[in-house]
A protein has these predicted regions:
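Extracytoplasmic loops and strand-loop junctions of Gram-negative outer membrane beta-barrel proteins
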Residues: 33-36, 119-124, 168-172
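Short, flexible helix-coil linker/hinge segments at the edges of structured domains or between repeats
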Residues: 158, 163-173
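Cleavable N-terminal export/targeting peptides
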Residues: 1-27, 193-196
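Gram-negative (and chloroplast) outer-membrane scaffold detector with strong preference
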Residues: 51-137, 142-148, 182-196
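Transmembrane beta-strand segments of Gram-negative outer membrane beta-barrel proteins
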Residues: 24-37
Length: 196
């Protein structure tokens, strides 16, 4: 985990020193993401929901790739569950004045991971899975200046299909609609323009 943090920090530092920020979006690159960490006596959870990089084809249309993960450690039972997602995204922005934007984003992700479950014999078992996740959601963006923005995800419509690789994990699907704790979030983005 320490090496991953060092790698991500190095990539961000290199990007910040080799490209300059600009207010114009067309031809620009957007970096965004949200890191979350939560710790209790029972364990801890680390996630990125998600980290992305996108290219502006015009002032309002952004296409790119994002990656998200969630790692949950249970201290009492001594296990860790992992979830990963990666895939393309498309977003469109509608200005609502000088400092506010309404953003719509859609994503199609490949997912994989491992989890621990209690099986029919009441025994803890672990297994791995893969599948896909389709998601659409609105965001409200607040321009902070010099290419920085604070973005709030306010709802979600998504479909997740999970295919088990092990008998201990059931094939499953999940539909998420509306507003709840898993569909609301804050993140930050930085728009950059590559020197020509």
């Amino acid at each position: 985990m320490k090496n991953l943090k060092l790698f991500l920090a190095s990539c961000l530092a290199i990007a910040c020193f080799s490209i300059q920020s600009a207010n114009a979006q067309k031809g620009g690159v957007m970096l965004y993401g949200s890191f979350n960490y939560h710790e209790t006596e029972a364990g801890h959870q680390l996630s990125a929901a998600p980290l992305g990089v996108g290219y502006f084809f015009n002032d309002n249309m952004n296409v790119g790739l994002n990656y998200g993960f969630n790692t949950s450690k249970n201290k009492a039972l001594d296990f860790t569950d992992h979830f990963h997602e990666v895939g393309p995204f498309y977003s469109n922005t509608w200005p609502l004045g000088k400092h506010f934007n309404l953003i719509g984003q859609v994503e199609a992700h490949y997912i994989w991971g491992n989890e621990h479950v209690v099986n029919a014999a009441n025994v803890m078992a672990d297994g791995s899975y893969n599948g896909y996740l389709l998601r659409a959601y609105p965001l409200v963006g607040i321009s902070l200046g010099k290419g920085w923005a604070l973005k709030a995800k306010v709802a979600e419509l998504s479909y997740k299909k999970k295919h088990s690789k092990d008998a201990s994990i059931a094939n499953d699907h999940e539909i998420i609609t509306g507003i709840n704790g898993s569909t609301v979030g804050l993140g930050i983005s930085k728009n950059l323009f590559i020197k020509g």
